[in-house]
Amino acid sequence: MVNNMTDLTAQDAAWSTRDHLDDPVIGELRNRFGPDAFTVQATRTGIPVVWVKREQLLEVGDFLKKLPKPYVMLFDLHGMDERLRTHRDGLPAADFSVFYHLISIERNRDIMLKVALSENDLRVPTFTKLFPNANWYERETWEMFGIDIEGHPHLTRIMMPQTWEGHPLRKDYPARATEFDPFELTKAKQDLEMEALTFKPEDWGMKRGTDNEDFMFLNLGPNHPSAHGAFRIILQLDGEEIVDCVPDIGYHHRGAEKMGERQSWHSYIPYTDRIEYLGGCVNEMPYVLAVEKLAGITVSDRVNVIRVMLSELFRINSHLLYISTFIQDVGAMTPVFFAFTDRQKIYDLVEAITGFRMHPAWFRIGGVAHDLPRGWDRLLREFLEWMPKRLDSYEKAALRNTILKGRSQGVAAYGAKEALEWGTTGAGLRATGIDFDVRKWRPYSGYENFDFEVPVGGGVSDCYTRVMLKVEELRQSLRILQQCLDNMPEGPFKADHPLTTPPPKERTLQHIETLITHFLQVSWGPVMPAQESFQMVEATKGINSYYLTSDGSTMSYRTRVRTPSFAHLQQIPSAIRGSLVSDLIVYLGSIDFVMSDVDR
């Protein structure tokens, strides 16, 4: 293995609390807007966090977007109910807040803008004038918190039914089903809900037809096999040509972020597996790393390599399903059955190590659940001998097929500018020629010590390029796994830290305070320091991140989960307008998404 650490991770510990006043962007902002225009918040997010006035928000955003090395991507946007937060020393007074997370690819740096709001004046201007992908994020922010977005093109519910009442992520909104009245579906309510699902083109600025002909409006989903889940797209058609479309999401929404406010730091780990249910341990990684930043925990090299190994196994598992179902969407059936044979080998290996298959919930705050079992290396070696030859056969028999290439090359194509505008990450972004893989540019869990390449496209991201990049990513994951096999360090599988590891039994028998603390941490969960932390990872479908806010409790005050698929589905209309319905099926297969990752 080789060292490839970038300069992004400063020499400070990953969990240090910093205000990032030395970041060049802070100086640029102060030179433009004055030294006292902002409040800079010290956090453990690893990025500058700047509170701006609502009246300056768009001006500051436009300034950042036009810098010599601009902040070109709106990575995330959401809100927080600050009313019950007790640890706010030095922060602007706020009942609610909205944050805007921007990324500069050229700088390889981020900045987070925050706006403080009072309860009797909940409004911010729409950010869609600067970043079109703010649309869905702002709809969700309004829906979950009741924060009005002034100038938004279509401010309506996105996750919840149109008939829903209330704003679920407010602190005064119930978090458990038992806090609601029993649900009853009367005939009148059923009729009301069905009427709410009726699509009205005028609500979306669509015409029902031209002077000479009417458009057809067609529902694709929410139960269509090519929709890859409970996902509905309303198509405006002129013959078979897609004039426009409206993606309709939320059918799989489970309230994952609300659950984070009612689970202990430890007991929330199983929920992370269900965010993107194919990713397994990959989903656990950003959460446990973010909590470890809050706690100030550093894990052993062995833990880092074990985590990387499990993550890459699940990456291969997810990519195999993606590639085979893409081929199936184009029209070839056989490869998907071969792929499930290969995925079974991965599940056998994962089960031997963790005891579970799809949702191991195996990573722990400060380590992993238990050490590697005897014989793990033999199972991994057998898989590494098997998989490369199978991958070659997929490529030769199906992916180089003339018909498949003809159906996917040039379909749903977009360039780097559009990818950045819509918050596209993962293979969809790299296919445009932008070399941005978090494992390389912002290494975590020891990825800087592995020798692997990042596949990058030639400038245009189309369906075929995206799937071929995933094939090469599979090969790179196999390289990483080989290095895990050859270089597994010795050492503990759990950090010796009071917030994660029980004390020695003999000490609990002699010191009552130690026993009391142990009892409280096991029964109620550990208390994390009051701070904010953030961690992004290169997940199976793009960049996944957790932004955690602790108020010095056994539970998270706010758990924000940013998933790649949410951004990718918002991009669908811009990429598919003018194409045929058959092209849409190929495009959906090339995105690589599951609806749990979209809806959370």
From Swiss-Prot:
Topology of this chain in the membrane: Peripheral membrane protein
Compartments where found: Cell inner membrane
Region of interest (NADH dehydrogenase I subunit C), residue spans: 1-190
Region: NADH dehydrogenase I subunit D, residue numbers: 214-600
Keywords carried by this UniProt record: Cell inner membrane, Cell membrane, Membrane, Multifunctional enzyme, NAD, Quinone, Translocase, Transport, Ubiquinone
Oligomer status and interactors: NDH-1 is composed of 13 different subunits. Subunits NuoB, CD, E, F, and G constitute the peripheral sector of the complex.
Protein name: NADH-quinone oxidoreductase subunit C/D
Name of the coding gene: nuoC
